[in-house]
Amino acid sequence: MRNMHTNRRSPGPITSAATQRRLKPEPEPTVKKFIKIILLSRIIEKMMKVPARFVRFGPKLTDNVTLQTPVGFKRSIRIKRIGDEVWFEKGWSEFAEAHSLSDGHFLFFHYEGDSCFRVVIFDVSASEIEYPLDDTDDNREEVMDDDEQGFTGFESSDDDGEVVDMDELLKKKKKKPRVNIKSENVIILD
């Protein structure tokens, strides 16, 4: 008898449709950006709701996300899930306070992958804010010059003693009044 040779390949392992779906990489999210307008009620609650459409069609978020501003300020934010809703919770109020967010500010969120968002912040005049240099900005001490004649800069309490020249810093940044919200009172500091 002659040895018959066929061109048919032997079938590979048979997998179920459910297994095939699990093996496919997660599709690219269709929604990667959203805008939020800051409301006084949300500042008081110390949480911010992520838009439902972003939650539904955007990337799957881990329990912690990172918010990063254009100057490199980063803050880790804990996610709270309530039913189908997703909220920025723990760490959000610190982020809001560090950037002096108040009623009427709006934020542009751009998802960059790996549970990280780039955040651009606009004030009530629709102008981008001046960002704090980093999240350790509050750990600074005033430095007086040798003659005690006046303020010359800031010295960070956690660095190697480098002094920041305020004249140089002010040339780079235009000084704006900061707004702090205490309960429902708005106080403008010069």
UniProtKB/Swiss-Prot annotation:
Broad class of the protein's primary localization: nucleus
A GO cellular component annotation in the UniProt record: nucleus
Pfam families named among the record's database cross-references: B3
InterPro entries: B3_DNA-bd, DNA-bd_pseudobarrel_sf, Plant_B3_domain
Gene Ontology MF terms: DNA binding
Keywords noted in UniProt: DNA-binding, Nucleus, Transcription, Transcription regulation
Stored CDD domains: B3_DNA
DNA-binding region (UniProt annotation): 33-125
Cell compartments where the protein resides: Nucleus
Protein name, entry field: B3 domain-containing protein At1g49475
Region (Disordered): 1-27
Keyword DNA-binding among record annotations: yes
